[in-house]
Amino acid sequence: MKKLLVFMMAISLFAGCVTDKDDEVMGKDLKIAVTVGDEQTIYPSLLLGIGLTTAQSDEEFDVFDVVFKSKVKGNVKILFEATKLNFETIVTQSGCEEGQVISPRIKWDYDQLAAVRSPGLVDFTVICYVDNIECDRHNLRVNYRSVNECVYIAINQETDEVYDFTWMFGAYVNENHTKIDPFLQKIISNGIVTNFVGYQRDDETVMDQVFSIWHELQTRGVTYSNVVMTSNPSNGVGSQYVRFFDEVLDNTQANCVDGTVFFSSILRKIGIEPILILIPGHMYLGYYDVSGASYFLLETTKIGGLNLKEITSGNAVQILRQYIDVWITQQEYDAFVKGQITLNDMKNGISYRSFLDATDCNVDSHISNSEKFGNVLMYRFLPVQELRQIVQPIENATTKSAKTYSSELFKDLGKVKGKARKSLQR
């Protein structure tokens, strides 16, 4: 049974000086000393994402270990008092052996963990009882991080073993978010698509649905924001700041991970299966075609390359002139100036061309990296449908059933679709 030491807080229980002939400690003489592991940090995102999930059958994610340093008879009880992050937790057993380890499953307050948006400190009080007599108590001050900090890699400081947590990005994909339905209704009202049908038709319809999301975000003026670093001083844990669905929508800002999990949330909602594609320092989106054997790519950071919100009837002639030979031709621009093409059609057209560019731009590098996915650290191909077997949306962590991780997941990449169409005609 492996233990992730970088997340473990060790609580050592040791004996007083009074012993009997069997080297047992009298219950009243059992004392506790509290020591904290290297990290001394709680990551709410990790606790929420795996709250009801066993990530691997040979790994545990308990935060605390209790180690008994002496043999004791009687009924032993370890009590963790309630804090702002957890409910009172009690572990009991009959006697203890020297060196015995127990791992209390703390009763976390998942609603409070989900509300943690900035780092802080929390004091745990741990009390030891033998036969209902308090023997000792200690306070443990622990750091906690923002729920926006996604842990994606950890290193055991004692063994240098690396733990891959990239699947935790799936916890930020939330297909059940309450703001998705109003967002989809707004798209339909704009007329880019008349409804969302998932895979019920053909690949053209699938792409049109994805484009309608792209177009709406450009209409809202969503920009690229390279906010990825956190204030986490850890040398043993790699984490990245990830915005939730409502934060991207309300703040109209997204980095590569934000945009990818945002799109993935909507695609899952409308019945299109997304893929989180991770390479060192970057993430981009994939989504399956109707057959389920091939997939398209999408570079979500390119959304911010075109701000449709800033193009108005008053400045369109000036702004669109800058797009000649980039998103429009000279002939199309001249036709617009003459009133032969409407402003709405021009905006839809340049948005679609930017969408096709974002569809194409990663194809060649993706194919060249295909053998690295799943075999080289930080190259990961993560279908969200399969991620749901090991991690749930953070806001829904307490309502899902536990699943078991399969090491065979994420092996078959399938076939990436080739170059996209380049015409304004759709």
Place the predicted regions along the sequence by residue.
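C-terminal motif of bacterial Sec signal peptides marking the signal peptidase cleavage site
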Residues: 14-16
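Short, linear, compositionally biased motifs with a strong N-terminal bias
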Residues: 10-11
